[in-house]
UniProtKB/Swiss-Prot annotation:
Source lineage: Bacteria, Pseudomonadati, Pseudomonadota, Gammaproteobacteria, Vibrionales
Ranges in coiled-coil conformation: none
Protein name: Guanosine-5'-triphosphate,3'-diphosphate pyrophosphatase
A Pfam family this chain is assigned to: Ppx-GppA
Matching InterPro entries: ATPase_NBD (IPR043129), GppA/Ppx_hydrolase (IPR050273), Guo-5TP_3DP_PyrP (IPR023709), Ppx_GppA_C (IPR048950), Ppx_GppA_N (IPR003695), PyroPPase_GppA_Ppx (IPR030673)
Protein source organism: Aliivibrio fischeri (strain ATCC 700601 / ES114) (Vibrio fischeri)
GO biological-process terms attached to the record: guanosine pentaphosphate catabolic process; guanosine tetraphosphate biosynthetic process; nucleobase-containing small molecule interconversion
Gene name, Swiss-Prot/TrEMBL: gppA
Length: 497
């Protein structure tokens, strides 16, 4: 049976200090689609002794894992494969013994990369999969090293790899497995001491947003969501989780809502490192990145994706995949932007609100690929279910709720954490108006309108003669005015003479 050749496949393998990961993707419609993610907990760093000699047992765990990965690599062109080793393999004195057998198992050579190169590839993975403007701080806490990067767009401006990680900090500060204040204090202090040499450089550069790109950060976010918190990580939430952990005497007893058994062993050490980073760098908040080292390796093999804006690339790929009417989507987008600008540049409070509104206008008909009758419901489902690089979970939730309400179904927006409640309300009002005004799907047939706002009362001024000649649009606008007004969002339709 022939293997599929419909689009090129790529694979990246990361031999981390805590886990080995394999990512398989394909390049399709100008975007990257994940085909497989394989992870095995190897805890390679735990096999290092005081002389940095890797134990045979740890090496065997690694070889056993690579034997599994080798099967999948057989299906992928050699030139589309990247395999890297990180912190533990950088320091292991007997690394050659491990690599000789590992290379034989895989049929490919492993490249042990330096810490700065690891940081560079992590940043590329973040830049290609995470949205946001301005300068950002990226934090990746691994098993034996922690990378911190400041960059903007696709350019990294500061790259650091520090010799601390959740496995090494576990052995260094929680060796007795006691979840005491003393152990936490020592672990946090040790992390701050390790961070101190870079403090001045990083605070001088500064950043607008902070993202975490590691299993540690992902695990913490999952715990917060399981406990009813939002996805934004703050120091107060980290301290809250520390208090929860300290209610248990020993690590083996740890049972926090949302914490998986797989992550429990390195939870206190990873948490301590992140608390130290928050406190020393005075970080307000952190969100989870869409990718890191493995994604950076994959995107680095695909030349045409090197400098595309992430969110726009995602939108374009999704439009192609679901055969959306791109010209009409752009008409709705242009009118939405015009209506927002008429209400004032600061009417949508957060800077990310307008880009999110334009994403909604570009994708609002996606649910119609399933069924017209429940198009909004299907749109919401797809937006939340799809992998959309550049958009956080909270942003996908907001987009889904906007698109659920873009047509017949109408209600106030539910609680969400991507923008303020008032901005979400205003985004929905604009979206619905823009769709009604463009329903003939021809820019030459759309009316000239002026939208004004005072105390959240919207007044839509439109030519009376045009309304008389387009009775369906007039009727839909009148119905929309009633709907918005009935839930407290007053909308007035003003027919100009």
């Amino acid at each position: 049976m022939k293997s599929s050749t419909m689009s090129p496949m790529y694979a990246a393998i990361d031999l981390g200090s805590n886990s080995f990961h394999m990512l398989v993707v394909r390049h399709i419609n100008g975007s990257v689609q994940t085909m497989a993610k394989i992870k095995r907990k190897v805890r390679l760093a735990a096999g290092l002794n005081e002389n940095n000699t890797l134990s045979h047992e740890a090496m065997q765990r690694g070889w056993d894992c690579l034997s599994l990965f080798a099967e999948r690599l057989q299906d992928i062109p050699v030139e589309n494969i990247r395999i890297v080793g990180t912190a533990t393999l950088r320091v292991a004195s007997n690394v050659d013994i491990f690599l000789e057998k590992a290379n034989q198992i895989l049929g490919h050579n492993i490249n042990v990369i330096e810490g700065e190169e690891e940081a560079r590839m992590i940043y590329q993975g973040v830049a290609h999969t995470s949205g946001g403007n301005g300068r950002r701080l990226v934090v990746d806490i691994g098993g034996a090293s922690t990378e911190l990067i400041i960059g903007e767009g696709f350019e990294a401006q500061a790259l650091t790899s520090l010799k601390m990680g959740c496995v090494t900090w576990l052995e260094g500060y929680f060796k007795d497995r006691a979840l005491t204040q003393k152990n936490f204090n020592a672990a946090i202090a040790g992390a701050k001491e390790t961070l101190a040499p870079i403090l001045q450089q990083y605070t001088d550069l500064g950043w607008q947003t902070c993202v975490g790109a590691s299993g540690t950060v992902q695990a913490l976010q999952e715990i917060m969501l399981a406990q009813g918190m939002d996805e934004v990580i703050t120091l107060a939430k980290l301290k809250r989780l520390q208090k929860q952990a300290m209610q248990y005497e020993h690590l083996e007893e740890l049972d926090i809502d949302g914490l998986t058994l797989e992550r429990a062993l390195v939870f206190p050490s990873g948490l301590s490192i992140l608390i130290a980073i928050f406190e020393l760098l005075n970080i307000d908040s952190m969100t989870l990145a869409g990718g890191a080292l493995r994604e950076g390796l994959c995107y680095g093999m695909i030349d045409e994706l090197q400098h595309d804006e992430v969110c726009q690339r995602t939108i374009k790929s999704t439009q192609q995949r679901y055969q959306l009417d791109v010209d009409y989507a752009q008409q709705v987008t242009d009118l939405s932007i015009q209506l927002v600008q008429q209400c004032g540049n600061d009417w949508l409070i957060e800077p990310q609100a307008l880009p999110l509104l334009t994403a909604a206008t570009q994708l609002h008909e996606i649910g119609m690929c399933i069924d017209y009758k429940k198009g909004g419901e299907h749109s919401a489902y797809l937006i939340n279910a799809l992998d959309l690089p550049g958009f956080t979970r909270a942003q996908k939730h907001l987009l889904g709720e906007l698109l659920r309400r873009y047509r017949e179904y109408f209600s106030a927006m539910p609680t969400q954490h991507a923008v303020s409640d008032i901005s979400a309300q205003r985004m929905l009002r604009i979206l619905r108006l823009a769709i009604i005004l463009t329903h003939r799907r021809d820019v030459n047939l759309a009316p000239t309108v002026t939208l004004s706002e005072k105390n959240d009362v919207l007044s839509l001024s439109i030519d009376g003669a045009w309304l008389a000649a387009n009775p369906l649009t007039r009727s839909e606008l009148e119905i929309e005015a009633d709907k918005q007004t009935n839930i407290g969002w007053e909308l007035v339709i003003d027919a100009r003479d």
